[in-house]
Amino acid sequence: MTEFYVDNLSYALGSVKRTVDESAKSDTFSSAKLLRDSGFETHHLAAEGESVLDLAVKAVGPIRGSLTELHAIIWASCIPENATVGDRVQFERSRDVKPLMDFPASRLQSHLDAPQAIVLGLVQQACTSMLGSVRVACGLLTTEGDFENILCLTSDCFPSGAKYEQSYSLISDGAACCVVSRKPEGYRILACHQITNGAAVQASDEETAAVYFTYMNRIVNETLAKAKMT
């Protein structure tokens, strides 16, 4: 069986650093005490004008030297509007949809000078989109015999005015990336697995917390079984 590996992990956070107390004044649902008791201390937000593309460029910076032979870039977005850096005002003015298809993954490909790399976008998987990109990368390496290195990247900023909290977790703006390849370096991927419950797409925070441990127990056991581990 072909083996795949994850290596060259890197990340970047929004340029504005706050304390939990500062963010809890207006940008969270929970109190500062509850967030601190949950383990949160600092909060990072994108600066004004700092885009998901900017964060992505910052994230790949430390591993730039390892990205010289990319065959694919998979950009994973949690929030759908982060899948484009296009100008909606320009679209409304011109009524041409082209500005809405100004994809950050294509811009990142150009920034990395990787014209040989195909570009894919992944969305509608929320906070597990990065894990989904790794699974897609393994699929590409399986079917495309000439592919060797695939950059998986996720980058998200909350929209202006949003509360930076989901399911009692404080969320920062940021980006993260890794390279999935056949080279036996970094971490070997033993198995990929996921569970999708489409009926729970708009579940409340309370409902999400209620089913979390049930699903975690199930998915951990199913993943271990798939990897033939106990």
What spans do the regions from the language model cover?
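Conserved beta-strand elements of the Class I
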Residues: Y5-D7, H71-I74, N149-L151
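Conserved catalytic cysteine-centered active-site region
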Residues: T28, A32-L53, P80-E148
